[in-house]
Amino acid sequence: MPQNADSLAVVLKCRDWENPGVTQLNRLEAHPPFCSWRNADDARVNRDSAQKRSLNGEWTFAWFSAPEAVPESWRTSDLQQADSVRVPSNWQMDGYDAPIYTNVTYPIPVNPPFVPADNPTGCYSLTFSIDADWLQAGQTRIIFDGVNSAFHLWCNSRWVGYGQDSRLPSEFDLTHFLLKGENRLAVMVLRWSDGSYLEDQDMWRMSGIFRDVSLLHKPATQIRDLRINTRFNDDFSRAVLEAEVRTTGERRDDLRVTVQLWDSETFVGEKTAPLGSEIIDERGAYPDRTTLRLNVEHPALWSAETPHLYRAVVQLHAADGTLIEAEACDVGFRQVSIENGLLLLNGKPLLIRGANRHEHHPENGQVMDKETMIKDILLMKQNNFNAVRCSHYPNHPLWYTLCDRYGLYVVDEANIETHGMVPMNRLSDDPVWLPAMSQRVTRMVQRDRNHPSIIIWSLGNESGHGANHDALYRWIKSEDPSRPVQYEGGGANTAATDIICPMYARVDQDQPFPAVPKWSIKKWLSMPGEQRPLILCEYAHAMGNSLGGYAKYWQAFRQYPRLQGGFVWDWVDQSLIKYDDDGRPWSAYGGDFGDAPNDRQFCMNGLVFADRTPHPSLYEAKHAQQFFQFALLPGAECQIEVTSEYLFRHSDNEVLHWSLALDGNPLTAGVVTLDIPPQGRQIIALPALPEAETAGQLWLTVRVEQPQATAWSQAGHISAWQQWKLGEKLATQWPQHAGNAPQLTSSGTAFRIVAGEKRWEFSRQQGVLTQFWIGEEAQLLTPLVDQFTRAPLDNDIGVSEATRIDPNAWVERWKAAGHYQAKAVLLQCDADTLASAVLITTAHAWQYQGETLFISRKTYRIDGNGEMQITVDVDVASGTPHPARIGLSCQLAQVAERVNWLGLGPHENYPDRLSAACFERWDLPLEEMYTPYVFPSENGLRCGTRELLYGAHQWRGDFQFNISRYGQKQLMETSHRHLLQPEAGTWLNIDGFHMGVGGDDSWSPSVSAEYQLSAGRYHYQISWR
């Protein structure tokens, strides 16, 4: 007895999900998103179409360990054990199966095209009704915008088709499957398919119907494709809108196509032509298509700065004017080109201020909603980003529409990555895999080509370089010559890219890896015969407490025109919310779901946390990328030169606030309106500035504010700022106490000093300050001791983990040398009474396994006013690794509500990441001095500090500090921030010197030499009262 062609058994026998030659069955051709309006005015204003219906919502769902476990009866009716889930969603976020986070390593055994027999399978079903008029005429389609990883579709128990490529739509014709009354859809989704070998991106591996599902009803004769291009004369004063329209359905001689162009409510013009009017070659024209050209005088040009959009409405109608169907899209008049080694937009060289962005939501997984998309765009714009790379797959279709409207340049990237293959180009150089790769590239272009925000196509990510790439590069250049193509794989400079687009190339340092060397970005420009622009597809790995040295990249970008910026890795931490036994949420990373293999916290590389609150590094990026640059001009008068890096917009909504302050105390201020043309300058002459009358540092600060709200910012938004230290009137010390010295007493174990209501006790056996009283209140919970270590940053750890030690990682070097285990050996502890002060002198050798790592000498000078001046000299052994810090640490007994300091702030800053910080007097709650990185580490440092006030205490000097309820030991030993427990009192770290955080990448030591503590001797001094 022959098998039913619709049966599960037939589908299982074919095993299409293990055949790279089968990427779809019965799927319709790719095209731009359609709405099939039946009223041209509805199309013009983008009104909801009555011909489009969402199927999002509650679906019936059953989960199985493998497709073979799905009962045949499911195809025809819901199973008794079925539950319900919301579509779109990832089933792992609903408690089925586990998400897996891995970066390079495939989550399944590598045996392409085969996948494990244990292949989790989700069975979805939905019952719905169809309007009677949809059944009478026309075509009804179903559109799945994203399903991971592959799926088969049935309608009313009849098999419809198959699709894979999780990040592009699969669209099927349901017309002949639909019935009057209720209809039932059944969708069998497989977690793994041969397509999974092309989707080895650095992200959580999740499954399910995770993008929108909708029905679309089109007439029998219909628009099947729409391609929009804009062309210009030399000075962009005249343009041509070119609309290529393709149709399908009944052949009719009376069909006409009209394109109308609107500028908001203003009608610009229209053009009408019959089908078949465009002669292609000597054999004639395509009978089902036409190309319409509409001249536009003085078009308003689109750019990320000025995202002016027109609206094109395309109508298919009969000769008598009867409208059959209308489609529409936003149109941006803009031109992308590469000339003389520069990437140009509308004839101007771009400077890409970009971020790589994964589609990630902490609670919804890879399901993106409009609100989150808009939040990302607004944050990018507010922080001076102008570009985004869709890493590493085509995004939700709404994303591009929003980028068009708000103004972001987009690199649209094919859903291809084979990072875990050995060699990496194993599939991209295999012709068997060309059809699968081709579908992912060509369908992306066919869906997204009409978006002006997309300025570059990308062939994918980290898939080596093979003949398949070369073929697909040539296809795109033929199909869409209006955009360049980039591809990093195989060394960033192969023939398959128009742009040199390396990842993690450094500014001045070569990384001569075998086969694929990463030269410094400066060197790359001078390679023989190389004339392409260089735009880093990934740089500045923002993992945890990172982004050190970011300003150095931007100095290079501004110095060398062909260095045209790059895309930070990456935008958002990919942590996921889990709940503890008491229902409290916490942030999870790789391994927290029992997932194996996993790459632990490597999924958290964002400039923002998963909930989109900023990392401190975001402020550094904002400052480095700001569109206004400032220079303090030399001369007797104080003049500031403001340069605009905007290419297309006049500064019509900016005022410059300037202020002069002495040690944070305002002296004078003013406001000037900025009136700067694109790429222009304005000189601002300030009035005569007052001189400092008392000791302190004189700082001039300028801030650019937008008085009026914009589409992406609120009124009062600060877009740029800069500070200059104009001078310093020195007072080398506080006035020395001229009265009697404090009282010094000693015993066999301690030195005790009394000055008024203050008392100090130093251990003679340990040589440290063990206690400090104010009145009867003890101020210390732990002694004041040297500190040379920090709770490791992600950049300090690199790729090291328990099962794979990288001896070159900073933390492993520090461990091996004994920095964390070193013990202090007392060399000296003396006390002397001077005329007006008591002097305690100590010396320690910090040793590990008999080796001396550091020698620390301290002098404590305590006067009768109760001021203790601490002078520290540290010698670093020549053979030991450069230390993380040179400073002091103690646990204060007091827990005060606020912290006040004069120094750089307000946000966390480190020696190689402090360009965005300003020198002022700051005051913040104690809890805001801690940065809640999901993976705990050293955090919260404030550099350039002159004074610190906390509770009853005051410190002065030139130092860096962090202060919080969490000690370095707990930060080092705790895996997740929600496990941290506030400790007794407050931990204070005061550093004379602190190593940078690095960030060129996070897997090799990346702290630049100038920010390492490489000197043999260090000296610093603080006063405590």
Curated annotation (Swiss-Prot):
EC number annotated for this UniProt entry: 3.2.1.23
Entry binding sites for substrate: 103, 202, 462, 538-541, 605, 1003
Binding positions (Mg(2+) 2): 598
Cofactor note: Binds 2 magnesium ions per monomer.
Source species, domain of life: Bacteria
Any one of the GO BP annotations: lactose catabolic process
GO MF annotation list: beta-galactosidase activity; carbohydrate binding; magnesium ion binding
Keyword Ion transport: no
Cofactor: Mg(2+); Na(+)
UniProt binding sites for Mg(2+) 1: 417, 419, 462
Keyword ATP-binding carried by entry: no
Catalytic activity: Hydrolysis of terminal non-reducing beta-D-galactose residues in beta-D-galactosides
UniProt keywords, alphabetically: Glycosidase, Hydrolase, Magnesium, Metal-binding, Sodium
Annotated active site: 462 (proton donor), 538 (nucleophile)
PANTHER family tied to this protein: BETA-GALACTOSIDASE (PTHR46323:SF2)
Subunit structure: Homotetramer.
Record-given protein name: Beta-galactosidase
Organism: Citrobacter koseri (strain ATCC BAA-895 / CDC 4225-83 / SGSC4696)
Gene (name only): lacZ
